[in-house]
Protein backbone atom coordinates (compact mmCIF):
# COMPACT_ATOMS: atom_id res chain seq x y z
CA UNK A 1 0.00 0.00 0.00
CA UNK A 2 1.46 3.33 -1.11
CA UNK A 3 1.54 6.32 1.21
CA UNK A 4 -0.03 9.59 0.12
CA UNK A 5 -0.49 13.05 1.60
CA UNK A 6 -3.91 14.58 2.11
CA UNK A 7 -5.45 17.79 3.44
CA UNK A 8 -8.62 17.58 5.50
CA UNK A 9 -10.96 20.52 4.71
CA UNK A 10 -14.05 21.08 6.89
CA UNK A 11 -12.31 18.53 9.09
CA UNK A 12 -14.91 18.34 11.85
CA UNK A 13 -13.77 15.70 14.32
CA UNK A 14 -11.73 13.76 11.78
CA UNK A 15 -13.95 11.21 10.05
CA UNK A 16 -12.07 11.63 6.78
CA UNK A 17 -8.73 11.45 8.57
CA UNK A 18 -9.57 8.20 10.35
CA UNK A 19 -10.58 6.59 7.08
CA UNK A 20 -7.65 7.76 4.96
CA UNK A 21 -5.00 7.02 7.57
CA UNK A 22 -6.24 3.42 7.55
CA UNK A 23 -5.29 3.11 3.86
CA UNK A 24 -1.90 4.80 3.82
CA UNK A 25 -2.82 8.46 4.07
CA UNK A 26 -0.71 11.01 5.94
CA UNK A 27 -2.51 14.20 6.96
CA UNK A 28 -0.36 17.28 6.36
CA UNK A 29 -2.97 19.89 7.36
CA UNK A 30 -6.62 20.38 8.22
CA UNK A 31 -9.07 23.26 8.09
CA UNK A 32 -11.84 23.80 10.62
CA UNK A 33 -13.40 26.80 12.38
CA UNK A 34 -15.78 25.10 14.86
CA UNK A 35 -14.00 25.37 18.20
CA UNK A 36 -15.63 22.30 19.73
CA UNK A 37 -14.72 20.22 16.68
CA UNK A 38 -11.15 21.54 16.78
CA UNK A 39 -10.82 20.53 20.42
CA UNK A 40 -11.94 16.96 19.70
CA UNK A 41 -9.74 16.76 16.60
CA UNK A 42 -6.57 17.72 18.47
CA UNK A 43 -7.43 15.44 21.40
CA UNK A 44 -7.16 12.56 18.98
CA UNK A 45 -4.29 13.92 16.90
CA UNK A 46 -2.21 16.05 19.29
CA UNK A 47 -0.09 18.73 17.68
CA UNK A 48 3.69 18.53 17.76
CA UNK A 49 3.90 22.15 18.81
CA UNK A 50 2.81 23.35 15.37
CA UNK A 51 -0.77 24.38 14.63
CA UNK A 52 -1.66 22.56 11.41
CA UNK A 53 -5.20 23.97 11.32
CA UNK A 54 -5.47 26.25 8.29
CA UNK A 55 -8.69 27.80 9.63
CA UNK A 56 -11.20 29.53 7.38
CA UNK A 57 -10.92 28.16 3.83
CA UNK A 58 -12.28 31.39 2.38
CA UNK A 59 -9.02 33.03 3.45
CA UNK A 60 -6.70 30.31 2.11
CA UNK A 61 -4.84 30.45 -1.18
CA UNK A 62 -1.84 28.14 -1.36
CA UNK A 63 -2.09 24.82 0.47
CA UNK A 64 0.81 22.71 1.76
CA UNK A 65 2.03 20.08 -0.72
CA UNK A 66 -0.45 17.21 -0.89
CA UNK A 67 -1.81 14.50 -3.18
CA UNK A 68 -5.47 14.32 -2.18
CA UNK A 69 -7.86 17.05 -1.02
CA UNK A 70 -10.89 15.91 0.97
CA UNK A 71 -13.76 17.38 2.93
CA UNK A 72 -17.41 17.25 3.87
CA UNK A 73 -18.56 20.52 2.34
CA UNK A 74 -21.28 22.16 4.50
CA UNK A 75 -24.61 21.84 2.74
CA UNK A 76 -26.58 24.74 1.43
CA UNK A 77 -30.40 24.70 1.30
CA UNK A 78 -30.61 22.77 -1.98
CA UNK A 79 -33.72 24.40 -3.32
CA UNK A 80 -32.08 27.08 -5.45
CA UNK A 81 -32.92 27.20 -9.14
CA UNK A 82 -30.93 29.00 -11.78
CA UNK A 83 -27.24 29.12 -12.51
CA UNK A 84 -26.88 32.75 -11.45
CA UNK A 85 -28.33 32.03 -8.00
CA UNK A 86 -26.83 28.61 -7.29
CA UNK A 87 -24.10 29.85 -4.95
CA UNK A 88 -25.68 33.00 -3.51
CA UNK A 89 -26.20 31.32 -0.15
CA UNK A 90 -23.06 31.67 2.05
CA UNK A 91 -22.95 27.90 2.55
CA UNK A 92 -23.22 27.35 -1.19
CA UNK A 93 -20.38 29.81 -1.69
CA UNK A 94 -18.11 27.35 0.12
CA UNK A 95 -18.31 25.13 -2.95
CA UNK A 96 -16.88 28.00 -4.96
CA UNK A 97 -14.00 28.22 -2.47
CA UNK A 98 -13.38 24.49 -2.75
CA UNK A 99 -13.29 24.74 -6.54
CA UNK A 100 -10.91 27.70 -6.24
CA UNK A 101 -8.54 25.73 -4.00
CA UNK A 102 -8.56 22.80 -6.42
CA UNK A 103 -7.76 25.17 -9.28
CA UNK A 104 -4.85 26.82 -7.44
CA UNK A 105 -3.33 23.69 -5.90
CA UNK A 106 -4.11 21.00 -8.47
CA UNK A 107 -4.24 17.93 -6.19
CA UNK A 108 -3.90 14.58 -7.90
CA UNK A 109 -7.34 13.64 -6.58
CA UNK A 110 -10.13 14.86 -4.33
CA UNK A 111 -13.06 13.40 -2.41
CA UNK A 112 -15.91 15.65 -1.30
CA UNK A 113 -19.04 14.67 0.60
CA UNK A 114 -22.47 16.30 0.78
CA UNK A 115 -26.06 15.58 1.76
CA UNK A 116 -28.21 13.49 -0.57
CA UNK A 117 -30.31 16.53 -1.48
CA UNK A 118 -27.55 17.56 -3.86
CA UNK A 119 -28.60 14.80 -6.29
CA UNK A 120 -32.30 15.56 -6.02
CA UNK A 121 -33.72 16.28 -9.51
CA UNK A 122 -34.72 19.76 -8.33
CA UNK A 123 -31.07 20.53 -7.67
CA UNK A 124 -29.68 19.01 -10.84
CA UNK A 125 -28.39 22.35 -12.11
CA UNK A 126 -26.44 22.99 -8.90
CA UNK A 127 -24.81 19.58 -9.15
CA UNK A 128 -23.94 20.09 -12.81
CA UNK A 129 -22.29 23.44 -12.04
CA UNK A 130 -20.06 21.75 -9.46
CA UNK A 131 -19.18 18.79 -11.69
CA UNK A 132 -18.55 20.94 -14.78
CA UNK A 133 -16.34 23.29 -12.78
CA UNK A 134 -14.08 20.40 -11.79
CA UNK A 135 -14.07 18.96 -15.31
CA UNK A 136 -13.01 22.34 -16.68
CA UNK A 137 -9.99 22.15 -14.36
CA UNK A 138 -8.84 18.93 -16.02
CA UNK A 139 -10.36 16.30 -13.75
CA UNK A 140 -12.23 13.09 -14.42
CA UNK A 141 -15.18 13.45 -12.06
CA UNK A 142 -17.38 10.73 -10.57
CA UNK A 143 -20.26 10.98 -8.13
CA UNK A 144 -22.54 8.52 -6.40
CA UNK A 145 -25.02 8.33 -3.57
CA UNK A 146 -23.57 5.92 -1.01
CA UNK A 147 -25.26 4.57 2.10
CA UNK A 148 -23.05 3.91 5.11
CA UNK A 149 -25.11 0.79 5.81
CA UNK A 150 -23.57 -0.81 2.73
CA UNK A 151 -20.08 -0.45 4.21
CA UNK A 152 -20.60 -2.17 7.53
CA UNK A 153 -22.07 0.80 9.42
CA UNK A 154 -25.33 0.03 11.22
CA UNK A 155 -26.94 3.29 10.17
CA UNK A 156 -29.20 4.31 7.30
CA UNK A 157 -27.09 7.24 6.09
CA UNK A 158 -27.22 8.40 2.46
CA UNK A 159 -24.53 10.85 1.37
CA UNK A 160 -23.25 12.04 -1.99
CA UNK A 161 -19.57 11.54 -2.71
CA UNK A 162 -17.81 13.40 -5.51
CA UNK A 163 -14.44 11.99 -6.55
CA UNK A 164 -12.07 13.71 -8.95
CA UNK A 165 -8.80 12.49 -10.46
CA UNK A 166 -6.52 14.44 -12.76
CA UNK A 167 -7.40 13.23 -16.24
CA UNK A 168 -3.77 12.51 -17.13
CA UNK A 169 -3.46 10.25 -14.06
CA UNK A 170 -6.74 8.33 -14.32
CA UNK A 171 -5.06 5.57 -16.29
CA UNK A 172 -6.75 2.58 -14.66
CA UNK A 173 -10.21 4.10 -14.37
CA UNK A 174 -11.78 4.89 -11.01
CA UNK A 175 -14.87 3.00 -9.87
CA UNK A 176 -16.82 3.27 -6.66
CA UNK A 177 -16.42 0.49 -4.08
CA UNK A 178 -18.62 -2.57 -4.01
CA UNK A 179 -21.16 -3.06 -1.26
CA UNK A 180 -20.25 -5.31 1.65
CA UNK A 181 -22.58 -7.83 3.23
CA UNK A 182 -23.08 -7.72 6.98
CA UNK A 183 -25.07 -9.76 9.47
CA UNK A 184 -24.58 -7.35 12.37
CA UNK A 185 -27.55 -6.19 14.39
CA UNK A 186 -28.00 -3.36 16.84
CA UNK A 187 -27.70 -5.69 19.82
CA UNK A 188 -24.15 -6.43 18.61
CA UNK A 189 -23.25 -2.72 18.71
CA UNK A 190 -25.30 -0.97 21.37
CA UNK A 191 -25.07 -1.56 25.10
CA UNK A 192 -27.20 -3.80 27.33
CA UNK A 193 -29.69 -4.93 24.71
CA UNK A 194 -31.47 -8.24 24.71
CA UNK A 195 -30.37 -10.62 21.96
CA UNK A 196 -33.10 -12.57 20.13
CA UNK A 197 -33.67 -16.15 21.21
CA UNK A 198 -33.05 -17.49 17.70
CA UNK A 199 -30.20 -16.65 15.35
CA UNK A 200 -31.13 -14.22 12.58
CA UNK A 201 -29.68 -14.99 9.17
CA UNK A 202 -27.92 -12.29 7.20
CA UNK A 203 -29.89 -10.81 4.33
CA UNK A 204 -28.11 -11.61 1.06
CA UNK A 205 -27.51 -8.96 -1.56
CA UNK A 206 -29.87 -9.52 -4.48
CA UNK A 207 -28.80 -8.72 -8.04
CA UNK A 208 -30.59 -8.50 -11.38
CA UNK A 209 -29.65 -10.25 -14.64
CA UNK A 210 -26.98 -7.62 -15.29
CA UNK A 211 -25.32 -8.19 -11.92
CA UNK A 212 -26.56 -4.87 -10.57
CA UNK A 213 -27.65 -4.65 -6.96
CA UNK A 214 -31.41 -4.61 -6.35
CA UNK A 215 -31.98 -1.91 -3.76
CA UNK A 216 -34.20 -2.72 -0.79
CA UNK A 217 -36.07 0.10 0.94
CA UNK A 218 -34.83 0.60 4.48
CA UNK A 219 -38.27 1.55 5.75
CA UNK A 220 -40.04 -1.52 4.39
CA UNK A 221 -40.60 -4.88 6.02
CA UNK A 222 -37.51 -7.01 5.94
CA UNK A 223 -37.36 -9.86 3.40
CA UNK A 224 -38.69 -13.37 4.03
CA UNK A 225 -41.72 -12.05 5.87
CA UNK A 226 -39.83 -10.96 8.96
CA UNK A 227 -41.32 -8.38 11.30
CA UNK A 228 -40.34 -4.73 10.94
CA UNK A 229 -37.10 -3.42 12.45
CA UNK A 230 -38.72 -0.40 14.08
CA UNK A 231 -42.01 1.28 14.90
CA UNK A 232 -42.96 4.84 13.97
CA UNK A 233 -44.83 6.85 16.59
CA UNK A 234 -47.12 9.23 14.73
CA UNK A 235 -50.74 10.26 14.37
CA UNK A 236 -50.82 11.18 10.68
CA UNK A 237 -49.90 7.95 8.86
CA UNK A 238 -51.06 4.36 9.07
CA UNK A 239 -49.46 1.02 8.34
CA UNK A 240 -47.82 -2.01 9.96
CA UNK A 241 -45.04 0.09 11.49
CA UNK A 242 -47.20 2.98 12.76
CA UNK A 243 -48.36 3.38 16.34
CA UNK A 244 -50.76 6.19 17.23
CA UNK A 245 -51.26 8.14 20.44
CA UNK A 246 -54.76 6.72 20.83
CA UNK A 247 -53.20 3.24 20.93
CA UNK A 248 -50.91 4.35 23.77
CA UNK A 249 -53.07 6.67 25.87
CA UNK A 250 -56.23 5.38 27.61
CA UNK A 251 -59.01 5.76 25.04
CA UNK A 252 -62.35 4.11 24.31
CA UNK A 253 -63.07 2.16 21.13
CA UNK A 254 -65.30 5.04 20.05
CA UNK A 255 -62.45 7.54 20.52
CA UNK A 256 -60.10 5.31 18.56
CA UNK A 257 -62.66 5.17 15.77
CA UNK A 258 -62.98 8.98 15.69
CA UNK A 259 -59.23 9.41 15.51
CA UNK A 260 -58.88 6.89 12.67
CA UNK A 261 -61.60 8.68 10.70
CA UNK A 262 -59.81 12.02 11.10
CA UNK A 263 -56.45 10.50 10.17
CA UNK A 264 -57.82 8.90 7.00
CA UNK A 265 -59.56 12.06 5.80
CA UNK A 266 -57.36 15.00 6.85
CA UNK A 267 -55.40 14.85 3.57
CA UNK A 268 -58.55 15.08 1.46
CA UNK A 269 -58.41 18.14 -0.82
CA UNK A 270 -61.95 19.15 0.14
CA UNK A 271 -60.56 20.29 3.52
CA UNK A 272 -57.60 22.24 2.13
CA UNK A 273 -54.58 22.02 -0.13
CA UNK A 274 -52.00 20.96 2.47
CA UNK A 275 -50.65 17.48 3.05
CA UNK A 276 -52.82 17.43 6.17
CA UNK A 277 -55.61 19.88 6.92
CA UNK A 278 -57.46 20.94 10.09
CA UNK A 279 -61.10 19.87 10.04
CA UNK A 280 -64.12 21.58 11.55
CA UNK A 281 -66.62 19.87 13.83
CA UNK A 282 -69.13 19.80 10.97
CA UNK A 283 -66.53 18.22 8.66
CA UNK A 284 -65.89 15.43 11.15
CA UNK A 285 -69.59 15.05 12.02
CA UNK A 286 -70.30 14.22 8.37
CA UNK A 287 -67.98 11.23 8.74
CA UNK A 288 -68.73 10.03 12.29
CA UNK A 289 -72.27 8.99 13.12
CA UNK A 290 -73.90 10.92 16.00
CA UNK A 291 -70.72 12.84 16.84
CA UNK A 292 -71.01 15.26 19.75
CA UNK A 293 -68.52 18.12 19.84
CA UNK A 294 -67.81 17.26 23.46
CA UNK A 295 -66.22 14.03 22.21
CA UNK A 296 -63.66 16.10 20.33
CA UNK A 297 -63.08 18.29 23.38
CA UNK A 298 -62.26 15.18 25.45
CA UNK A 299 -59.64 14.22 22.86
CA UNK A 300 -58.22 17.74 23.14
CA UNK A 301 -57.90 17.31 26.92
CA UNK A 302 -56.09 14.01 26.33
CA UNK A 303 -53.63 15.86 24.07
CA UNK A 304 -54.58 13.74 21.09
CA UNK A 305 -56.29 16.61 19.26
CA UNK A 306 -55.74 20.35 19.40
CA UNK A 307 -58.23 23.09 18.54
CA UNK A 308 -57.23 26.20 16.63
CA UNK A 309 -58.70 29.68 17.23
CA UNK A 310 -60.94 29.25 14.17
CA UNK A 311 -62.51 26.21 15.84
CA UNK A 312 -60.97 23.57 13.58
CA UNK A 313 -59.34 20.43 14.93
CA UNK A 314 -55.99 18.85 14.15
CA UNK A 315 -53.86 16.19 15.78
CA UNK A 316 -51.75 17.41 18.66
CA UNK A 317 -48.80 15.50 17.17
CA UNK A 318 -49.22 16.81 13.66
CA UNK A 319 -45.60 16.57 12.46
CA UNK A 320 -44.36 13.17 11.33
CA UNK A 321 -40.74 13.62 12.43
CA UNK A 322 -41.83 15.06 15.79
CA UNK A 323 -43.27 11.72 16.79
CA UNK A 324 -45.26 11.35 20.00
CA UNK A 325 -43.98 12.81 23.27
CA UNK A 326 -40.69 13.59 21.53
CA UNK A 327 -40.06 10.08 20.19
CA UNK A 328 -40.33 9.42 16.46
CA UNK A 329 -39.07 5.87 15.94
CA UNK A 330 -38.16 3.03 18.27
CA UNK A 331 -35.76 0.49 16.80
CA UNK A 332 -35.69 -3.12 17.91
CA UNK A 333 -32.45 -4.67 19.23
CA UNK A 334 -32.38 -7.08 16.29
CA UNK A 335 -32.67 -4.29 13.70
CA UNK A 336 -29.98 -4.17 11.01
CA UNK A 337 -29.61 -0.40 11.21
CA UNK A 338 -30.44 2.72 13.20
CA UNK A 339 -31.81 6.02 11.92
CA UNK A 340 -29.65 8.74 10.38
CA UNK A 341 -27.56 10.64 12.92
CA UNK A 342 -27.83 14.38 12.28
CA UNK A 343 -26.26 17.54 13.65
CA UNK A 344 -29.71 18.80 14.64
CA UNK A 345 -30.34 15.79 16.86
CA UNK A 346 -32.85 13.04 16.38
CA UNK A 347 -36.01 11.58 17.88
CA UNK A 348 -35.09 7.91 17.42
CA UNK A 349 -34.64 5.58 20.38
CA UNK A 350 -33.80 1.93 21.00
CA UNK A 351 -35.97 -0.75 22.63
CA UNK A 352 -34.24 -2.58 25.46
CA UNK A 353 -35.94 -5.92 24.78
CA UNK A 354 -37.19 -7.90 21.81
CA UNK A 355 -40.80 -8.91 21.35
CA UNK A 356 -42.43 -11.63 19.30
CA UNK A 357 -45.84 -12.46 17.95
CA UNK A 358 -47.73 -14.97 15.85
CA UNK A 359 -48.62 -12.26 13.32
CA UNK A 360 -48.04 -8.56 12.63
CA UNK A 361 -51.00 -7.43 14.73
CA UNK A 362 -49.87 -9.46 17.75
CA UNK A 363 -46.28 -8.30 17.28
CA UNK A 364 -47.43 -4.68 17.34
CA UNK A 365 -49.71 -5.25 20.35
CA UNK A 366 -46.90 -6.93 22.29
CA UNK A 367 -44.56 -4.07 21.44
CA UNK A 368 -47.04 -1.53 22.84
CA UNK A 369 -47.65 -3.56 26.00
CA UNK A 370 -44.10 -4.76 26.69
CA UNK A 371 -41.96 -1.88 25.40
CA UNK A 372 -43.94 1.29 24.81
CA UNK A 373 -46.26 1.57 27.80
CA UNK A 374 -43.68 0.45 30.42
CA UNK A 375 -41.13 2.69 28.65
CA UNK A 376 -38.57 -0.03 28.05
CA UNK A 377 -36.78 2.10 25.48
CA UNK A 378 -34.16 4.82 25.69
CA UNK A 379 -32.08 7.31 23.69
CA UNK A 380 -28.68 6.17 22.48
CA UNK A 381 -25.55 7.39 24.26
CA UNK A 382 -22.67 9.36 22.77
CA UNK A 383 -20.44 6.29 22.67
CA UNK A 384 -23.20 4.35 20.92
CA UNK A 385 -23.70 7.14 18.39
CA UNK A 386 -19.97 7.07 17.70
CA UNK A 387 -20.08 3.32 17.06
CA UNK A 388 -23.09 3.75 14.77
CA UNK A 389 -21.03 6.26 12.79
CA UNK A 390 -18.09 3.87 12.57
CA UNK A 391 -15.72 5.52 15.08
CA UNK A 392 -13.44 3.29 17.18
CA UNK A 393 -14.02 2.86 20.90
CA UNK A 394 -10.67 4.56 21.60
CA UNK A 395 -11.80 7.86 20.05
CA UNK A 396 -11.87 10.76 22.53
CA UNK A 397 -14.86 13.11 22.56
CA UNK A 398 -15.80 16.48 24.01
CA UNK A 399 -16.85 16.90 27.63
CA UNK A 400 -20.09 18.52 26.41
CA UNK A 401 -22.42 15.63 25.57
CA UNK A 402 -24.89 17.63 23.46
CA UNK A 403 -21.97 18.96 21.43
CA UNK A 404 -20.83 15.40 20.80
CA UNK A 405 -24.14 14.39 19.22
CA UNK A 406 -23.91 17.41 16.91
CA UNK A 407 -20.29 16.70 16.00
CA UNK A 408 -20.91 13.02 15.34
CA UNK A 409 -23.99 13.82 13.25
CA UNK A 410 -21.92 16.24 11.16
CA UNK A 411 -19.13 13.75 10.53
CA UNK A 412 -18.60 11.36 7.67
CA UNK A 413 -18.62 7.65 8.46
CA UNK A 414 -14.95 6.54 8.45
CA UNK A 415 -15.65 3.05 6.99
CA UNK A 416 -17.04 4.66 3.83
CA UNK A 417 -13.85 6.73 3.51
CA UNK A 418 -11.75 3.58 3.98
CA UNK A 419 -13.56 1.99 1.04
CA UNK A 420 -13.10 5.09 -1.14
CA UNK A 421 -9.44 5.34 -0.17
CA UNK A 422 -8.87 1.75 -1.23
CA UNK A 423 -10.40 2.52 -4.62
CA UNK A 424 -7.97 5.41 -5.06
CA UNK A 425 -5.14 3.02 -4.22
CA UNK A 426 -6.41 0.68 -6.94
CA UNK A 427 -6.06 3.46 -9.52
CA UNK A 428 -2.36 3.48 -8.56
CA UNK A 429 -2.24 7.26 -8.28
CA UNK A 430 0.36 7.16 -5.58
CA UNK A 431 3.07 5.35 -7.48
CA UNK A 432 3.92 8.60 -9.21
CA UNK A 433 6.84 10.81 -8.19
CA UNK A 434 4.49 13.50 -6.90
CA UNK A 435 3.62 11.27 -3.98
CA UNK A 436 6.82 11.45 -1.97
CA UNK A 437 5.92 11.35 1.73
From Swiss-Prot:
Top-rank EC class of the record's enzyme: transferase
Q: Which GO terms describe its biological process?
A: DNA restriction-modification system; methylation; negative regulation of gene expression via chromosomal CpG island methylation
* InterPro entries, sorted: C5-Methyltransferase, C5_DNA_meth_AS, C5_MeTfrase, C5_meth_CS, SAM-dependent_MTases_sf
- Identify the EC number(s): 2.1.1.37
Which Gene3D superfamilies does the UniProt record give?
A: DNA Methylase, subunit A, domain 2, Vaccinia Virus protein VP39
* Keyword terms, alphabetized: DNA-binding, Methyltransferase, Restriction system, S-adenosyl-L-methionine, Transferase
Protein name according to UniProt: Type II methylase M.HgiEI
Q: What does this protein do?
A: A methylase that recognizes the double-stranded sequence 5'-GGWCC-3', methylates C-? on both strands, and protects the DNA from cleavage by the HgiEI endonuclease. This system is more active than isoschizomeric RM.HgiBI.
Positions of disulphide bridges: none
Q: Which family does it belong to?
A: Belongs to the class I-like SAM-binding methyltransferase superfamily. C5-methyltransferase family.
Q: Where is the SAM-dependent MTase C5-type domain?
A: 4-431
For this protein, the record's SUPFAM superfamilies field holds:
S-adenosyl-L-methionine-dependent methyltransferases (SSF53335)
User: What GO molecular functions are on record for this protein?
Assistant: DNA (cytosine-5-)-methyltransferase activity; DNA binding
> In which domain of life is the source organism classified?
Bacteria
Entry's Pfam families?
DNA_methylase (PF00145)
In this protein, the active site sits at 75
* Catalysed reactions, as listed in the record: a 2'-deoxycytidine in DNA + S-adenosyl-L-methionine = a 5-methyl-2'-deoxycytidine in DNA + S-adenosyl-L-homocysteine + H(+)
Organism of this sequence: Herpetosiphon aurantiacus
Amino acid sequence: MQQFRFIDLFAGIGGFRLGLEAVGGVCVASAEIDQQAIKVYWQNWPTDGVDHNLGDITQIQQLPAHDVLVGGVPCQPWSIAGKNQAFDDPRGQLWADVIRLVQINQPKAFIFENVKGLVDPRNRLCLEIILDSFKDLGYSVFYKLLNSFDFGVAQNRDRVFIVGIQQKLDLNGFSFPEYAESDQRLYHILDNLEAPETKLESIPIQRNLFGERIEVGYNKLTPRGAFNDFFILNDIRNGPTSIHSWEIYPTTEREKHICMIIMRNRRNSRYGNCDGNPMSYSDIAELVVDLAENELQILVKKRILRQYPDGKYEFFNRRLSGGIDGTYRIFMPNARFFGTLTARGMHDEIAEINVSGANAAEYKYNFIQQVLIPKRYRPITVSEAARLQGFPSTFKFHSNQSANFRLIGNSVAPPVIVALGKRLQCVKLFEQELCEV
